[in-house]
Amino acid sequence: MLKNIIKQVWNQRRQNGWILLELIIAGFFLWTVIDPVYVLTVNHFTPKGYEEDGRYVLRFGAYGEKHGMRDTTVTKEQQRTAIDNMLRLVRDCPEVESALLVQNSSFPNGGSWNGTTYYADTLKSEERKYVNTQEYTFNNAGGGNLFKTYGMKNALTGGDIEVPQDAGGRNLIYVSENFARHMFGTTDAVGKKVYDYRDRAHEIAAVFKDYKHRDFEPIYPLIIRVNNKVGVGPYMHWTYMIAFNLKKGVDEDAFVERFEKEVAPNMAMANFFYDRLLSFDKQRTTWAKQSGTY
């Protein structure tokens, strides 16, 4: 019986070869065309996890060591004060609802990505459970709250997420639904602890709704850390940005025009200067075009 089957297959090898070639072509088409379209379509209809309207990040620059405008007498403390003053200038705008200092990898569709690994315990074994995750960091000085500024919500209650002023000192962290499910198998993770690569414990203060860092990519685990200190160094203007959201009903074009005319010039201090505003929606469009998914 087996010999007859083998003989039949061999006698029809040319026909079978064409069938195999057709299957290979069809599989290649499904892999290169249908699968990406399916992924992009599903991803398009997946909630972002944040609000875009009226959300901006402000980038500032710094004069280099050889620049003619650089003041060589500026101290680190003056630079730290300058960052606080620039943040205050944004917060004092009547159109602005809230503003805070974030690291440059901590806003949607940004050009940077900060990845790390968190563990379920401190046991050094092959069975040690871990999650590779993206990490956002923001400064909560003066009541800064990334969740309110970005419009992110509590996954369990659907409400706002409050951030205690001492959250950074207590090593509190905030995790996405995706992270909680990967680590614990449930989103009911408030009060549980996870450990960083140095085995430092971090208590989960809240679980927020899944969040897309880049609009054209699937959702990835995300944790958000709070820092109540501003590190001072030669690359501060690359490390930090000011994120803010406008009050409802504000004319965004009119705001940007007024801001760049009246507020931005006042940000020239301690070798820093205003660079530009990036709106969340335009930033998303820019990255979509660069990725070829627009």
Give, region by region, the residue ranges found by the protein language model.
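A short amphipathic helical element positioned immediately N-terminal to and/or at the very start
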Residues: 1-10, 86
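Short, strongly hydrophobic transmembrane alpha-helices
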Residues: 12-42, 50
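Short beta-strand segments
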Residues: 19-22, 57-60, 99-103, 174-175, ...
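Membrane-proximal extracellular/periplasmic loop immediately following the first transmembrane helix
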Residues: 34-124
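Generic structural signal for small/hydrophobic residues in well-ordered secondary structure
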Residues: 40, 90, 96-99, 147, ...
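Hydrophobic secondary-structure segments that place a key small or acidic residue at a functional site
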Residues: 131-222
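"Rare, low-scoring activations can occur
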Residues: 169-170, 177-178, 198-292
